[in-house]
Regions:
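Short glycine-/polar-rich loops that comprise or flank the Walker A/P-loop
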Residues: 2-4, 20-24, 103-106, 147-151, ...
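Residue-level signal for alpha-helix termini/capping positions
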Residues: 16, 76, 101, 127, ...
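Conserved phosphate-coordination/catalytic loops
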Residues: 57-65, 87, 116-117, 134
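Short, acidic/turn-prone active-site loops that include or flank metal/cofactor-
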Residues: 112-115, 157-161
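Conserved helicase core region in the C-terminal RecA-like lobe
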Residues: 135-140, 152-159
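Conserved SF2 helicase motif VI
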Residues: 159-174
Length: 174
């Protein structure tokens, strides 16, 4: 468009115009101290984040338990959830999937390496209500349309407003 914006719309206006659904945002504070983690390429080192979120034993379990308890506190009916959980690494997505399954919340995970047929099957299972969550890493920030998604879990920090809004948008479709 010769460096001209054809149209621009902000989140509040899109909600007011009923292009996106209104939402409730719940911030849950965990007890994980990230102060000592290395900073790499404008964010926390993903390898270090992955270790603390998956391999730190009681810390990782306590954080995952906090997520499950908060979910059960704020969600009216867990059987109606169709959610995405954004994770920092393949190990983190697998850990969260396993933890949710162990706590009676049917879940699966996908990564950037998951073949299209697996992604399609996962989407169908979520829409059909066979699973409550798909935990993802390096996919579904954009380019996926699952209007049935009604819950988004931000399970990793991001310094990018663009990525945050893209992930939030996965749960705002009408």
């Amino acid at each position: 468009f010769h460096n001209r914006i054809a149209a621009e719309i902000r989140l509040p206006e899109a909600i007011d115009r009923k292009l996106l659904c209104p939402f409730q945002y719940f911030g849950v504070t965990d007890t994980v101290d990230l102060d000592q983690l290395r900073w790499s390429r404008g964010g926390y080192d993903k390898g270090e984040l992955s270790k603390i979120y998956t391999l730190s034993g009681a810390i990782a379990d306590r954080r995952a338990d906090l997520v499950v308890r908060a979910l059960l506190k704020y969600i009216t009916d867990i059987d109606e959830v169709k959610g995405l959980g954004f994770c920092v690494s393949i190990e983190h997505a697998a850990f969260m999937c396993r933890y949710f399954n162990e706590h009676g919340i049917p879940s699966i995970y996908l990564t950037g390496q998951s073949p299209d047929v697996e992604r399609s099957a996962a989407k169908q299972r979520l829409v059909a209500g066979e699973v409550r969550f798909i935990f993802v890493v390096d996919i579904y920030n954009e380019g996926v349309d699952i209007p049935e998604v009604n819950t988004v879990l931000f399970l990793r920090p991001t310094e990018s407003l663009t990525i945050f809004l893209q992930q939030l948008g996965r749960g705002l479709r009408l």
